Amino acid sequence: MQRRAGLAVLSVLALISAACSGSSDDAAPNSDAPTVAEAPTTDPPTTDEPIENPPATNAPDEATQPSLTDSLAVVKPGFVISPGVEQVSITGATPGSTISIVTTTMADQRMPVGAVNAPPDGGEVDGYGSFLFRNLDATTDWRLVVDGASITEPIDVLARDEHPDPAFFAEQSLAPGVNYIEMRDGTTLSANVVLPGPIEDGPYPTVVEYSGYTPADPNGTGFKDLFTPLGYAYVGVNMRGTGCSGGSFRYFEYVQSTDGYDTVEAVAAQPWAFENHVGMVGVSYPGISQLFVAQTQPPSLAAITPFSVIDDSYNSTLYPGGILNTGFAVKWTQDRVDNGKPAITPTGEIIETGGQGWAKDAITAGDDVCAANQSLRMQNPELVAEIFDSPFVDSSDNTDGLSPRLFVGKINVPTFIAGAWQDEQTGGRFPTMLDRFTGTDKFYVSLMNGLHTESIGPANFPRWVEFLDLYVAKRTPTLDTARVIAPILASGIFGTGELALPADRFAGMAYEDALAAFEAEPSVRVLFEEGAADGTAARTPLPRFVEEFESWPIPSLEATEWFFGNDGSLGDTAAETASQTEYLALPDGIPATFLAEESAGNSGDIWKLDVQWDWQQNAPGTAANFITKPLSETVTMAGSGSADLWVQSSVGDTDLEVTISE
């Protein structure tokens, strides 16, 4: 964020209406299937071979110059072409050669003599022999031009809704340990399968965690240690272009969503997966990914539990309020760029910097698939540079595709979403999209004050277990095992002592009765004053009280208006005369972070009970302050707010932050 000192002037005619964590890895067939989705399975030829009977072309007339197909040899290329969802990847090509892509129409077009055709898109093959074309129209046939001397036959790319036949997934077998799941374009994703017992004792209710972190790391810790004691099979899957997964990584491009579809279907097809359906779990990144995957409507997806999520990548996280989020979003993105770097050189030597450590360990131990899957990593885009180059929302750059609020209406499975308004990583805007989940009538919400991990705190954990038991395991919920796990979870994340979970609410009920009772409850639960429960230490992640509502926004909510007064007052009527107030905008006048030095070394410390804060009030004259008279009755602010301001600044750019407090 660029910091400027300047004089900001606010008109008093203003109206207020109130109604992840990502850390770097080393820190801790069938005939109905679309044949275009199959990558070559044999070694490619090492030289370009002319096609025996190339398509006939007419000689150009005198008024035109030859087309590309007139003038270039049509060949079978000496590399692997893998058409994917709106993509074409090239592997095994000669490093340094040039590859361009043109539409078949462009390739066949004869231009008037002297005219210049539009230059094809493309570039130079990288040192790994790879190149990737993105954002291709699936309704168009494409051809590759190699070194300006030869051209391929037409290539069909896959549309977003061209899903494989179920037989494609049924033919894949996954066993406990590290596996590779094949996607519709031939890319393989690394997956770690952990079962709660012997495979012959299955089937087991199954959950999938899917992200660009390290869920497929067999030696990592995380949700696999949480769900297997609860009786669930756990499958952690690395997104393409991360860890040991093949392909190239770009933040939530659509192929990651269809990869999620393929992952769900492949896992659900396993004989050890209960009822051949799976649920999805995850907080933050693997929570957000559930929204992207569920929009594709995988037939075997039972339910999702997206916790600590965003409603819009740009407005909630990258540029909240139009201000670049250098505190979290830029660093998080840089971590993803670094994690997505190749683990090995083109000749197979381990690269010390970048990449994911567990992938390097796997390659060193002889995992040849992991090694081969590093080949497209140099095609990962420079995401941080794109952020700085895109300070404004532009739907033509696919920002709409990165906005869950625009597609959550497509989600048609039971959904349980939870999060906190003061989430320091993903922000507090996600409740603004809750009324957009119109595709499912099994929709449950837990809202609370607090930070990023509050959603999996002990206050919400029992409801999470109940939801998964009812909609994935399809059994009467019990918290017996959860009572053992919850204190360990709370201690590790929040630094708490012993915490007791409530009694089983559905004890003695048949499954159908428990499900009916759960569905009869209000769907929205708000945990008030989290961290201030009576009889507990300060900041213990428990609420003082809980209220339930039928929907969000709360139907009985009444919008409240407050007006700035001439004398620094805040009242329910507008001032009769206009005036203004001035302050010196001095961003450097307060600390860049509100953590004390002893708590600033580890980002996880912010969630602990003993966190030390260093919150400082703005110095006199560096903020405009307005205050109400003492309220005559208790008022609860619930929902979104807005501030209408008329601003004049002595500098070209100034940031504004509006805080409502008591």
Protein language model regions, located:
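A catalytic-pocket lid/entrance helix-loop region that shapes and gates access to the active site
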Residues: 255, 266, 281, 285-358, ...
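Cap/lid segment of the alpha/beta-hydrolase catalytic domain
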Residues: 189, 198-269, 620
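Extracellular mucin-like PTS domains
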Residues: 31-58
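C-terminal motif of bacterial Sec signal peptides marking the signal peptidase cleavage site
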Residues: 16-19
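Accessory cap/linker subdomain of secreted extracellular hydrolases
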Residues: 292-411, 479, 499-504, 509-521
